[in-house]
Amino acid sequence: MNINVDVKQNENDIQVNIAGEIDVYSAPVLREKLVPLAEQGADLRICLKDVSYMDSTGLGVFVGTFKMVKKQGGSLKLENLSERLIRLFDITGLKDIIDISAKSEGGVQ
């Protein structure tokens, strides 16, 4: 389980910086951090710049977070995705559902 999740709450949004691998072992830790934030209905901006690996379990965490945030009236944006992660979201069709970007708009660096 090799993951680090840093959360910073700002006036307008919550910024989350994730580092490490998102897989079947680390996904529960990530979910545990994201669920309370999603339940707030806040605007979440998640920086994935330092994510070295993600499997389908990680996709599931982000889909669940997206659904919860939307239900509570907030938004979710994934930022600083590598080409590999963008491709993963693209081939699964999630790129058309979840707001993703290869660049940051002021997220945690």
Curated annotation (Swiss-Prot):
Post-translational modification: Phosphorylated by RsbW on a serine residue. Dephosphorylated by RsbP or RsbU.
Domain STAS: residue ranges: 3-109
Residue positions, PTM Phosphoserine: 52, 56
SUPFAM superfamilies, per database record: SpoIIaa-like
Pfam families reported in the protein's UniProt record: STAS
GO molecular function: anti-sigma factor antagonist activity
UniProtKB keywords: Phosphoprotein
Record bears the keyword Cell membrane: no
Residue positions, PTM Phosphothreonine: 57
The keyword Phosphoprotein appears for this protein: yes
Listed result of changing residue 56 to D: No interaction with RsbW
Domain of life of the source: Bacteria
InterPro entries according to UniProt: Anti-sigma_ant (IPR003658), STAS_dom (IPR002645), STAS_dom_sf (IPR036513)
Family: Belongs to the anti-sigma-factor antagonist family.
Quaternary structure and partners: Monomer. In stressed cells, forms a complex with RsbW. The predominant form of this complex has a stoichiometry of 2:2 (one dimer of RsbW is bound by two monomers of RsbV). Binds to RsbW in the presence of low levels of ATP or under conditions of energy or environmental stress (through dephosphorylation by RsbP or RsbU).
Function: Positive regulator of sigma-B activity. Non-phosphorylated RsbV binds to RsbW, preventing its association with sigma-B. When phosphorylated, releases RsbW, which is then free to complex with and inactivate sigma-B.
Protein name, UniProt field: Anti-sigma-B factor antagonist
